[in-house]
Amino acid sequence: MRVDVLTIFPEMFTGFLNTSIIKRAREQGRLEVNLVNIRAYARNKHRNVDDYPFGGGPGMVMQAEPLFLAVEDLLPGGEAARPPVILMSPQGEAFNQGMAEELAREEHLILICGHYEGVDERVRLALVTREISIGDYVLTGGELPAMVIIDAVTRLLPGVLGAPEGAREDSFAMGLLEYPQYTRPRSFRGLEVPEVLLSGNHEQIRRWRRQQALERTWRRRPDLLARVNLSPEDRRFLEEISRREGERTP
């Protein structure tokens, strides 16, 4: 996969691109990240890419022309060869695992990192194909959201993770929060590893993990359960949790 990132702060990506899974994916040739400095496309001697908003108001607005020129420079094949052009924006769709899986099927992505008070609306009208938000909060710019998207998508690329089942069993990949994980030692400061995980009985372990994931989701993110394909056994387990909690409530 190729990801072009349009940014005015390419140096922010140095550590991100050279550590952990992202570094390995790049070394394996499974991920190519091309950092494009938007200022290189500014047509003024000071390389400014922002200006005052028409109609007045606080802050500055990112100009349309440098963004159009940068994207057009990345697409020598023209409109027919255009990949998704995604603007990092608090007005965008909320990013989730399903969206990561969708984007992981693309061969090429272009991510635009906004700054200042936002971007000229003509970028949305005539250049961007999608807007994505990573949450209902304000960040200085789109660089961190772009890193989040690259990380989530890269994990899903074939061959990137050593154990493919790891990506499938991560929180949200199954629609549920992940079950508790333990490693050695078996006992730590009076806290013991659940016996079922030491039993060697794979069916009991599978059932325990499923129930733990269900209960954790029920307690922390009950909204997710509406989108999960629950078995009759799952439903009975959740009903039992609900009944027990009801008995504890005065």
Curated annotation (Swiss-Prot):
Task: Indicate whether Methyltransferase appears among the record's keywords.
Answer: yes
User: Which domain of life does the UniProt lineage start with?
Assistant: Bacteria
- UniProt subcellular location: Cytoplasm
Q: Which Gene Ontology terms describe the biological processes this protein takes part in?
A: tRNA N1-guanine methylation
List, in alphabetical order, the Gene Ontology terms for molecular function in this entry.
tRNA (guanine(37)-N1)-methyltransferase activity
Note whether S-adenosyl-L-methionine occurs among the keywords: yes
In which residues is S-adenosyl-L-methionine bound? G114, I134, G135, D136, Y137, V138, L139
A single cellular component GO annotation: cytosol
Main site of residence?
A: cytoplasm
Please name one Pfam family that this protein belongs to: tRNA_m1G_MT
* Alphabetized UniProt keyword annotations: Cytoplasm, Methyltransferase, S-adenosyl-L-methionine, Transferase, tRNA processing
Q: What class of enzyme is it?
A: transferase
* Catalytic reaction(s) noted: guanosine(37) in tRNA + S-adenosyl-L-methionine = N(1)-methylguanosine(37) in tRNA + S-adenosyl-L-homocysteine + H(+)
Q: What is its EC number?
A: 2.1.1.228
HAMAP family, alphabetized: TrmD
Family statement: Belongs to the RNA methyltransferase TrmD family.
Record text on subunit structure and interactions = Homodimer.
What does this chain do? Specifically methylates guanosine-37 in various tRNAs.
Q: What is this protein called?
A: tRNA (guanine-N(1)-)-methyltransferase
Question: Lineage, please?
Answer: Bacteria, Bacillati, Bacillota, Clostridia, Moorellales
